[in-house]
UniProtKB/Swiss-Prot annotation:
<comment type="function">
    <text>This protein is an auxiliary protein of DNA polymerase delta and is involved in the control of eukaryotic DNA replication by increasing the polymerase's processibility during elongation of the leading strand.</text>
</comment>
<dbReference type="GO" id="GO:0005634">
    <property type="term" value="C:nucleus"/>
</dbReference>
<dbReference type="GO" id="GO:0030337">
    <property type="term" value="F:DNA polymerase processivity factor activity"/>
</dbReference>
<dbReference type="GO" id="GO:0006272">
    <property type="term" value="P:leading strand elongation"/>
</dbReference>
<dbReference type="InterPro" id="IPR022649">
    <property type="entry name" value="Pr_cel_nuc_antig_C"/>
</dbReference>
<dbReference type="GO" id="GO:0006298">
    <property type="term" value="P:mismatch repair"/>
</dbReference>
<dbReference type="GO" id="GO:0070557">
    <property type="term" value="C:PCNA-p21 complex"/>
</dbReference>
<keyword id="KW-0235">DNA replication</keyword>
<keyword id="KW-0597">Phosphoprotein</keyword>
<dbReference type="InterPro" id="IPR022648">
    <property type="entry name" value="Pr_cel_nuc_antig_N"/>
</dbReference>
<feature type="cross-link" description="Glycyl lysine isopeptide (Lys-Gly) (interchain with G-Cter in ubiquitin)">
    <location>
        <position position="164"/>
    </location>
</feature>
<comment type="subunit">
    <text>Homotrimer. Forms a complex with activator 1 heteropentamer in the presence of ATP. Component of the replisome complex.</text>
</comment>
<keyword id="KW-0238">DNA-binding</keyword>
<dbReference type="GO" id="GO:0009617">
    <property type="term" value="P:response to bacterium"/>
</dbReference>
<comment type="similarity">
    <text>Belongs to the PCNA family.</text>
</comment>
<dbReference type="Pfam" id="PF00705">
    <property type="entry name" value="PCNA_N"/>
</dbReference>
<dbReference type="GO" id="GO:0043626">
    <property type="term" value="C:PCNA complex"/>
</dbReference>
Length: 260
């Protein structure tokens, strides 16, 4: 059987919030090393990859590998029934057609027990190659979310230009243009608030803002976000989940200015 217990259950609630608007259903691959998920969004433009390592759970048992087909909006609805302070346990038998979700208050005075039907999904696993990136920008996740939100008022695509000294986000539309430049921070006491840039060569790429705004739904999971870019390959937007894993979003650049 499979059983995973997470005292800080709010992490799981945040993970579902980060996924459910982008993908409707996905296969949760459960093994002794943890839980992983990989899925294209419904329009096959972006890819999301989630890893939750078993050692990040407070207790974890998986006797044999499972592939659980999950409707993410259903799971999100059930997780909304859990309080932010609740302990969450996920449980499934080896050949289960349902996933049990148990929510306990810290004082054990209230225990809620839900069962969610699983789906049969045919899933193709895409190999994601390990890449060296021309530019890797690490910045506060709230700042990135705000930039994407602000520039969405101007246009539907953002040009990200990365150089040694800073990164620039630009959008243009019928009402005009907007540019936001972040300089690399020279000395910051708090790592969470720093903007750091590792650059091998400058990069200038255009991305659809509506997808980036979907990705920023993961902001509550991490105080920082990492953007990895190279010409002609997908951007990677990564949110680390403390002591547990990460959620990574992949988005191919738009080909040229005229078509956007």
């Amino acid at each position: 059987m499979f059983e995973a217990r997470l005292v800080q259950g709010s992490i799981l609630k945040k993970v579902l919030e980060a996924l459910k608007d982008l993908i409707t259903e996905a296969c949760w691959d459960v093994s002794s090393s943890g839980i992983s998920l990989q899925s294209m969004d419904s329009s096959h433009v972006s890819l999301v990859q989630l890893t939750l390592r078993s050692d990040g759970f407070d207790s974890y048992r998986c006797d044999r590998n499972l592939a659980m087909g999950v409707n993410l909006s259903s799971m999100s609805k059930i997780l909304k029934c859990a309080g932010n302070e609740d302990i969450i346990t996920l449980r499934a038998e080896d050949n289960a057609d349902a996933l049990a979700l148990v929510f306990e208050t810290l004082n054990q005075e209230k225990v809620s027990d839900y069962e969610m039907k699983l789906m049969d999904l045919d899933v193709e696993q895409l190999g994601i190659p390990e890449q060296e990136y021309s530019c890797v920008v690490k910045m506060p996740s709230g700042e990135f979310a705000r930039i994407c939100r602000d520039l969405s008022q101007i246009g539907d695509a953002v040009m990200i230009s990365c150089a040694k000294d800073g990164v620039k986000f630009s959008a243009s539309g019928e009402l005009g243009t907007g540019n936001i430049k972040l300089s690399q921070t020279s000395n910051v006491d708090k790592e969470d608030e720093a903007v750091t840039i590792e650059m091998n060569e400058p990069v200038q790429l255009i991305f659809a803002l509506n997808y980036l705004n979907f990705f920023t739904k993961a902001t509550p999971l991490s105080k920082t976000v990492t953007l990895s870019m190279s010409a002609d390959i997908p951007l990677v937007v990564e949110y680390k989940i403390a002591d547990m894993g990460h959620v990574k979003y992949y988005l191919a650049p738009k080909i040229d200015e005229e078509s956007s």
